[in-house]
Amino acid sequence: MPELPEVETTLRGLAPHLVGQRIHGVILRRPDLRWPIAAQIEQLLPGATITDVRRRAKYLLIDTDAGGSAVLHLGMSGSLRVLPGDTPPRAHDHVDISLQNGRVLRFNDPRRFGCLLWQRDCETHELLASLGPEPLSAAFTGDYLHALACGRRAAVKTFLMDQAVVVGVGNIYAAESLHRAGISPLREAGKVSRERYRRLADAVKEILAYAIQRGGTTLRDFISPDGAPGYFEQELMVYGREGEACRHCGGELKHATIGQRATVWCAACQR
């Protein structure tokens, strides 16, 4: 599933092609995604101008002058591309938003776990209203994590992936951040010290910022808007490397399932 760096990479690739463009039309080839695409999308978007494209957590928000925004989530396998308007649709190309410049924003989603919604006020939508702070914002600190974790018995990795705690940190970047901070993913969240949470918050910020710089992590389902690969995959320290040698100490990386998610860590480096 695309995580924050992949969604941010998508945003940065799309925004220059979308902002200021007038929407010519909308084609819904298959509206039954994770949630049905509202018919009002076809009615409200044509004729509207895109005023901004932004990100909240793993959601892309396409603001318009039609009094609302299109809310997009890539789900497990979704991708967005800006293509010449005469590009024939392929399998799983479910939505086209055609633009005045003759190009088309195309949403492809083989597994159909993504979504396209319409919302008058994005901040009040039930999917967005209860989200935690952005990890790259000043609000996300080790002191914040330590205070929120007090008394929690869940594994720290599960805690870090809770979108009400902090948004956009999924399985890949939680594993990598915990490794950099030297914290075992198995440790109870409420038993991690303030100082170690400060290291963890710094690690999350550093790894996410670097992953964005590298274009995200190209795994099975992520495609950036220009089709270029994300190069952070080449630098993963633990994720997906169970049984291999730790790149820091040389010890064998361990594997377990935590919160129904595959987890890899180094028992020597992470305590």
From Swiss-Prot:
Quaternary structure and interacting proteins, as annotated: Monomer.
Binding residue positions for DNA: 92, 111, 152
Cofactor-binding details, from the entry: Binds 1 zinc ion per subunit.
Family stated for the protein in its record: Belongs to the FPG family.
GO biological process: base-excision repair
Reaction(s) catalysed by this chain's protein: Hydrolysis of DNA containing ring-opened 7-methylguanine residues, releasing 2,6-diamino-4-hydroxy-5-(N-methyl)formamidopyrimidine; 2'-deoxyribonucleotide-(2'-deoxyribose 5'-phosphate)-2'-deoxyribonucleotide-DNA = a 3'-end 2'-deoxyribonucleotide-(2,3-dehydro-2,3-deoxyribose 5'-phosphate)-DNA + a 5'-end 5'-phospho-2'-deoxyribonucleoside-DNA + H(+)
Lineage top rank: taxon: Bacteria
Protein task: Involved in base excision repair of DNA damaged by oxidation or by mutagenic agents. Acts as a DNA glycosylase that recognizes and removes damaged bases. Has a preference for oxidized purines, such as 7,8-dihydro-8-oxoguanine (8-oxoG). Has AP (apurinic/apyrimidinic) lyase activity and introduces nicks in the DNA strand. Cleaves the DNA backbone by beta-delta elimination to generate a single-strand break at the site of the removed base with both 3'- and 5'-phosphates.
Organism: Xanthomonas campestris pv. campestris (strain ATCC 33913 / DSM 3586 / NCPPB 528 / LMG 568 / P 25)
Protein name as catalogued: Formamidopyrimidine-DNA glycosylase
Active site positions, chain numbering: 2-3, 58, 261
Zinc finger (FPG-type): 237-271
E.C. designation(s): 3.2.2.23, 4.2.99.18
Keywords carried by this UniProt record: DNA damage, DNA repair, DNA-binding, Glycosidase, Hydrolase, Lyase, Metal-binding, Multifunctional enzyme, Zinc, Zinc-finger
Cofactors, names only: Zn(2+)
Molecular function per GO: 8-oxo-7,8-dihydroguanine DNA N-glycosylase activity; class I DNA-(apurinic or apyrimidinic site) endonuclease activity; damaged DNA binding; DNA-(apurinic or apyrimidinic site) endonuclease activity; zinc ion binding
